[in-house]
A protein has these predicted regions:
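Well-ordered, non-membrane alpha-helical segments in soluble/globular domains
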Residues: 62-65, 92, 211-219, 252-263
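Substrate-gating cap/lid alpha-helix
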Residues: 242-275
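Histidine-centered active-site loop/cap adjacent to the catalytic His
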Residues: 289-312
């Protein structure tokens, strides 16, 4: 009995220590940045991933899309809430937090088609478990318990393990062609024509299921915003589709049209417009005219800023 109470006291001390320490730990990016932004009362919150701010070495103007939009719409205060690898799963938690705040900024959400691919969707470092926990916690007090809850495995801090990620099926259309482990990151980083071709296939040529978890997040984002009277504008980011078609012919564009149609169908079902920019520009608008990337150069970012400005 004495041993039992000793262990009980020990675990209580550890638990309380973790709580005390957690008060001195800075909130993760999503929760901290969103909280600070809401306090400042911006008119527009611009979500997004690296497609918002990536630039080309040759750009004379390296401003992100958000800054270009500010120049086009000087009457609006626009906050940049973009960060590399952000996605609809995180945006769902962010919109939920905004709805709880009672504030009603306009929100702009870019939809990156590659974020639905097994290659990105299940990548462990893109799950943002800690940020989503902070954003969806019932109260700030509960959020303070993240550290002890994680230590004692009361919450799942590894939504997808690397082992699970490597076993994720990879598809070309509806046909499985392997698993993630069959495609080596380091090898694909070398830009040979064959590796570029493979990267286009991994990033875009899967068949997007309407039941995909990120599309569930899209539906939830719209429902939360509609209930709270928050206006959201969506757009699908430009894709270097001409380069993809060089490798795969009409199969590439047909699959991409099918996938973007799946996204747009959900938006239209929810009475939202779908600004589909996927096929709107040629390779000269991209950071690299040959690589499978949504990263735009100066001309490309200005094009997107102008299209978004028309919605506001």
């Amino acid at each position: 009995m004495k041993i039992f109470w000793s262990w009980t006291v020990f675990f209580i001390i550890i638990f309380l220590s973790q709580i005390a320490i957690s008060h001195f730990i800075t909130e993760p990016w999503g929760a901290r940045t969103l909280s600070e932004t809401l306090d400042k009362g911006y008119d527009v919150l611009y979500f997004g991933d690296s497609t918002v701010d990536a630039s080309a070495d040759t750009d004379t103007d390296k401003a992100p899309i958000t800054e270009m939009l500010r120049r086009l719409k000087p009457e609006l205060s626009i906050a940049d809430l973009s960060r590399s690898s952000n996605h609809l799963g995180l945006y769902e938690a962010m919109v939920g937090q905004i709805a709880k705040s009672g504030k009603k900024p306009v929100i702009i959400i870019p939809i990156n088609m590659r974020s639905f691919s097994p290659w990105y969707d299940k990548r462990p470092e893109f799950q943002f478990e800690k940020e989503i926990f902070y954003l969806t916690a019932p109260s700030p007090l509960i959020a303070c318990f993240y550290k002890p809850l994680a230590v004692f495995r009361a919450i799942n801090v590894n939504a997808v393990t690397f082992s699970e990620f490597y076993q994720t099926p990879v598809y070309r259309g509806k046909k499985q062609i392997g698993i993630v482990a069959d495609f080596n990151d380091t090898v694909l980083a070398t830009t040979t024509p064959e590796n570029i071709k493979t990267s286009f296939m991994l990033g875009y040529m899967f068949d997007l299921d309407a039941k995909h978890r990120k599309l569930d997040s899209l539906r939830n984002i719209i429902d939360q915003a509609d209930r709270s009277g928050i206006k959201i504008y969506f757009y699908i980011t430009p894709i270097n589709h001409e380069q993809g078609e060089k490798f795969y012919g009409k199969e590439f564009k047909e699959q991409m049209e099918k996938n973007t149609d799946t996204v747009c169908a959900i938006l239209k079902e929810k009475k939202h417009s779908c600004l589909n920019l996927a096929f709107s520009v040629d390779p000269s608008y991209f950071q690299s005219p040959v690589l499978p990337s949504e990263h735009l150069n100066e001309k490309g970012r200005m094009f997107v800023a102008e299209e978004v400005a028309k919605m506001l």
